[in-house]
From Swiss-Prot:
SUPFAM superfamilies: Small protein B (SmpB) (SSF74982)
Keyword line: Cytoplasm, RNA-binding
Chief localisation class: cytoplasm
UniProt subcellular location: Cytoplasm
Name of the protein described by the UniProt record: SsrA-binding protein
Residue runs in coiled coils: none
GO function terms (MF aspect): RNA binding
Amino acid sequence: MTVMKEKGRKVIATNRRARHNYTILDTYEAGIVLVGTEVKSLREGKASLVDAFATVDNGEVWLRGLHIPEFSHGTWTNHSPRRVRKLLLHKREIERLVGKSREGNQTLVPLSMYFSDGKVKVELALARGKQDYDKRQDLARRTAEREVTRELGRRVKGMR
């Protein structure tokens, strides 16, 4: 995966399945505690958010399931690829997340990971899981929108 520039920040990884499997209710920007070889591996653009999720334990937010492969030029000091990593949020934000996630069927899902001013940030979303019929409705809606824009494009071309 290559590093892309988006809105003045270098995007390392995105969780494209998250928007398909979840309804995004709210987003937060969080810092992440990393070791040196993890940052070097991220600078190479290597990370996977596919199975990642966040939990709140004892007033701290932890990111689980994030895969950052070992640094290619690392030695015995390399990190464990799937270790649990701490997310850095303000206390008020954590309390708000705990309150909202306890309301029912809501989870914390990372949407993207990026560099901002040399620091790695995680875009974290409070989300609710979609049912299969919700996914089918979204797919039908997107297909209809695509057909409408295609037809409008054809009509505009025909007028020239």
